[in-house]
Swiss-Prot record:
Pfam families: CsrA. Homodimer; the beta-strands of each monomer intercalate to form a hydrophobic core, while the alpha-helices form wings that extend away from the core. HAMAP family: CsrA (MF_00167). Keywords: Bacterial flagellum biogenesis, Cytoplasm, Repressor, RNA-binding, Translation regulation. This is Translational regulator CsrA. A translational regulator that binds mRNA to regulate translation initiation and/or mRNA stability. Usually binds in the 5'-UTR at or near the Shine-Dalgarno sequence preventing ribosome-binding, thus repressing translation. Its main target seems to be the major flagellin gene, while its function is anatagonized by FliW. Belongs to the CsrA/RsmA family. One of its GO terms (cellular component) is cytosol. It comes from the Bacteria. GO terms for molecular function: mRNA 5'-UTR binding.
Amino acid sequence: MLALSRKKDEAIIINDDIEITIIEIKGDQVKLGISAPKSVPIYRKEVYAQILDSNKEAASSVDVKTLNQLFKK
């Protein structure tokens, strides 16, 4: 993992098209601004974990026989 120090209004660039800027620092919270192409999904880590869990749950509840019947049509 790369660890960088930044101050308010400073930024980092990732892959020429993603810019992360430090907008505000209050105590132990840091507010980030992220500029990226619309094709790049951006999630908070805890939200992304919930999405993955939901996808796994949805995939595991599908009956294989039902899927096979759908694809035969």
